[in-house]
Amino acid sequence: MKKLILLLLFIPLLGFGQNLEKEKLQSVVKTFFEGFHNKDSLLIASVIDSKFYLNSTSFKEDNGVLRNINGDNFVSAIVSRPDSPVWKEKLLSFNIKIDGPLANVWVDYEFWVDDKLSHCGVNSINLLKFF
């Protein structure tokens, strides 16, 4: 009975730790997009690995298309883009799954260009925790 009571005392702490990790992951994603919007390569670099890469999916003639983009090229394109038109990616909701050092952050978004909705979709971001 003592073991059961002790276990029940720690269950809420386990959930709290998971929520704290989710908050940290959400903060990482928000920091990335803050750097994206401000064309700040240092801010972006503070939350990505040097081996970062981006995959982009789309449809062409009803077929799925996958593009692989080198992270350095992506960041260079973001920070060197002109000030106009203004890009704004609005992050709408976060669904975060964590398993050990691996996390997936699923983020619904709207992409606006000069205050006009361009498109919407989902960012699926895989993150790895380095100990």
For each predicted feature, which ranges?
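Sec-dependent N-terminal signal peptides
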Residues: 3-17
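Short, low-complexity N-terminal intrinsically disordered segments enriched in polar/charged residues
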Residues: 15-46
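Short, solvent-exposed loop/turn segments at secondary-structure boundaries
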Residues: 20, 117-118
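Short, solvent-exposed secondary-structure junction/capping segments
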Residues: 30, 34, 48-62
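Hydrophobic pocket/interface hotspot
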Residues: 32, 44, 52, 105, ...
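Surface-exposed, charged secondary-structure patches
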Residues: 58, 66-116
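Short beta-strand edge/turn micro-motifs at domain boundaries
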Residues: 104, 120-131
